[in-house]
Amino acid sequence: MIRAILTDIEGTTSSLSFVKETLFPYARARMADFVRGHARDATVQALLADAKAAAGDPSMDDEHVIARLVRWIDEDRKITPLKALQGLIWEEGYRNRDFFGHVYDDAVRRLKAWHEQGISLYVFSSGSVHAQRLLFGHTAAGDLQPLFSGYFDTRIGAKQEPAAYSAIARELNLPPSEILFLSDIEAELDAAREAGYKTFMLVREGGAKASHHPQGADFDAIRPELL
């Protein structure tokens, strides 16, 4: 019996194009001005220190770390301080209504139905928890945050490592076999299955893929009670 659903965001609840074509360019274009304008903010200072450590050069000056952050965006690196800084920049964008968080209609519909059925819903994304909350809190369908019981990011572990899913199961105090993980990435699903989870692959573009995971084109294809 599935008691909790853990979902990815990019390519799963939300379109890849929203992240790649809206969020990433928005943060990239504003990274330098944001860092310079908030250089005395304690939170930003701590994140810059973490970014310098991740770059292997704690003595790096701010201009060089800005250049490194922009390069990491271009390389789509999943580096925790970068993701946190992106989240702070996106917060300004959501607040200014420069964009809304994209969530597929079928995902909204099924998430609401599962919530009403008493299934606990959680998010696991490489984006920071702050960024996750912003996306689901500012959608065209309204604030979806009340649907979710918790959020996880790379601080719990890498998404392609079984240990991350084991850690999440411990946090939820549930047997892994009672958790369903949703993603569009085979390696993430493999890691979750190795940890004992049930899995389902979203294939929103390009048709069915060769996979040993159950799959479907949208959330309406997911039947937790049958997995």
Curated annotation (Swiss-Prot):
It holds the Pfam family Hydrolase. Keywords: Amino-acid biosynthesis, Hydrolase, Magnesium, Metal-binding, Methionine biosynthesis. Its EC number is 3.1.3.77. The keyword Magnesium applies. Binds 1 Mg(2+) ion per subunit. GO terms for molecular function: 2,3-diketo-5-methylthiopentyl-1-phosphate enolase activity; 2-hydroxy-3-keto-5-methylthiopentenyl-1-phosphate phosphatase activity; acireductone synthase activity; magnesium ion binding. It catalyses: 5-methylsulfanyl-2,3-dioxopentyl phosphate + H2O = 1,2-dihydroxy-5-(methylsulfanyl)pent-1-en-3-one + phosphate. It comes from the Bacteria. The keyword Amino-acid biosynthesis applies. Pathway: Amino-acid biosynthesis; L-methionine biosynthesis via salvage pathway; L-methionine from S-methyl-5-thio-alpha-D-ribose 1-phosphate: step 3/6; Amino-acid biosynthesis; L-methionine biosynthesis via salvage pathway; L-methionine from S-methyl-5-thio-alpha-D-ribose 1-phosphate: step 4/6. InterPro entries: Enolase-ppase_E1 (IPR023943), HAD-like_sf (IPR036412), HAD-SF_hydro_IA (IPR006439), HAD_sf (IPR023214). Its cofactor is Mg(2+). GO terms for biological process: L-methionine salvage from methylthioadenosine. Bifunctional enzyme that catalyzes the enolization of 2,3-diketo-5-methylthiopentyl-1-phosphate (DK-MTP-1-P) into the intermediate 2-hydroxy-3-keto-5-methylthiopentenyl-1-phosphate (HK-MTPenyl-1-P), which is then dephosphorylated to form the acireductone 1,2-dihydroxy-3-keto-5-methylthiopentene (DHK-MTPene). Monomer. NCBIfam families: enolase-ppase, HAD-SF-IA-v1. HAMAP family: Salvage_MtnC (MF_01681). Belongs to the HAD-like hydrolase superfamily. MasA/MtnC family. This is Enolase-phosphatase E1. It comes from Methylococcus capsulatus (strain ATCC 33009 / NCIMB 11132 / Bath). The gene is mtnC.
